[in-house]
Amino acid sequence: MTKRPTRVSLAIATCVLLSTGRLSTAGAELGPKLYFDPCPPFAPEMTFDCYHDFAEVEQFLRDAAAAYPELASLESIGKSYQGRDLWLLTITDRSGGDPSDKPAVWVDGGVDADEVVSIEAALGVVHRLLTSTDPEVADLLKRRTFYVAPAIIPDTSELHMRTPERPRDSTLRPWDDDGDGALDEDGVEDLDGDGQALTMRRENPNGDWTPSEEDQRVLRRRRPGDAGPFYERWTEGIDNDGDGEYQEDRPGGVDPNRNYPGNWSIGQRGNGPFAGSETEIRALMEFAAAHPNIAASQHFHSSGGVVLRPPSVPDWQLPQSDLDLYLRLAERGLEVSGYDLATSVYDWSWPRGSGNRKRGQIWRNDEGELKGGLSRLDGYAAYGGSIDALYEIFGVVAFANEIYQMGEDDDGDGRIEGHEALRWDDEELDGRAFKEWEPFDHPQLGRVEIGGWRKFGQNNPLAEDLAEEVRRNVDFVLMQARNTPELAITKLEAVPLGGDVYRVEAEVANRGFSPTELAVRTQSGRAVPVRAEIGGDGIEVLSGDNRLDLGVLAGHSARETEWVVRASRRSELELSAWHPKGGRASSAVGIGTE
């Protein structure tokens, strides 16, 4: 049961609500879409210069499926905590075979609440696949299937788009963050009525923050010997429950990207009551389990302009062959995306890069060349993430692109610090990403200043920069699709042995770049072998079984096999090869006599 605010807090909250017209809490009724005009409808000529709210995402997907019924089908794979549909669009050219018989790529967005550019990138994948006139895209759709789920956690994405709140990464399952027995009782408020709940600061000689020497607008952590001034800081809002803390129990509390049942940890903050506890994450995992043809995945996030791969633990825990595959694909990913860094989650120094490059990282130097770097001992363990889960459990080559780099590394230390981001905002964005500090009379704290980074421009690009980010990330997904495993029958011959007996000689190849199974699956005993099977009317197999297991096929490799058969009459011998991630291939040869 949610604890009721004190009488004083209720009075203050009422005052704030009347003065701003909004009170941003999980239980509040959502207002209209903020910040952007309605987005134009789905159309071949549309451009991505608008952020979609959930209703517009739904309409986009319905329109896309209706416009291209031969390529796209729309379904809901589950419900969010608040009951919104988790929409998924299956895209493939069915004239090339059943969707489940082709190697597939999973694409999702909207997992982290304030990273709404990820939704646009996923919609961009849909748009490119359906509307492109490029023959290579048409050919890819004959040979691949795409499963695109643009809005995995729509409840909190809606908070971002339709309330002043910049929500944390969370589902909207209520959670007692501060352990007081109440749930979600102290959220944020837009006190100054500018449409966004930003940051408050107040001078205090005991504060932990002080202005940066590089730019006084930026607060950095206090160091020994600092002279001040010193500040306290909070997210904009009031103390709703009268406990002396501010915004310590905001809406939700379970981080969906720490709730996946891959490398999940009981000690990870935001992990939830148990692995896969959240309805949205469970729906995704159940879909993946039911679709073993998913060979690659892209889980869009923001920001940093970084290509992330597993693991969320040190690289030595990854099988070497899998690590080698990831490094080669990541390097190609940097080439097609133009981003500057590809790294494991563990070795990524959030938010903008790593000052001491690791051997497992690939990065772009000042001349634009892609390089590998030196070793580093420290790391960032983020347990229960999507790419670890898809990789570990299902053997999927999973990437997570952190879309959009805001600013430049002016001093070459491998990071984009706050003052460097502010310079970029001043010079390139005309100051639209950062609100200058302005005084405000807080009903509880007294005189404070309100300002800081706005919702768009820092973590999500401004609308005019959105299309380029969408383009480069769609290119990355198509690169992933081109490099999945893909089975082909490269040889099928029937050699007469005398009478009506023949030796059937066959070769099954993986003409894709990736192996049919990753080493992580082989080591865990979960690998599925490539299977080859012969048959036909009047065909009798004399040696062995008509169905053979060919094991795992590495990328660009082939395996020969043979059978001895009897053909009692003239008929057609058929050979089929299948692997869930490599697809289905078939061929036939005439055999026997009249």
Model-derived segments and their meaning:
Residues S118-R162:
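Short helix-loop-beta-strand segments that form the rim/entrance of peptidase-like active sites
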Residues G583-T593:
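Edge beta-strands of extracellular beta-sandwich domains
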Residues V508-Q523:
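Short amphipathic, basic-aromatic surface patches that mediate peripheral association
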Residues L30-D37, G78, I91, T145-Q268, ...:
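Surface-exposed loop and adjacent secondary-structure segments within mature catalytic domains
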Residues S73, F146-P150, D155, M161, ...:
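Metallocarboxypeptidase
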Residues I539-S568:
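Intrinsically disordered, low-complexity Pro/Gly/Ser/Thr-rich segments with frequent PxxP/GP/PP motifs
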Residues S9-R22:
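Bacterial N-terminal signal peptides
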Residues S571-P580:
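Short, aromatic- and glycine-rich surface loops/edge beta-strands on solvent-exposed regions
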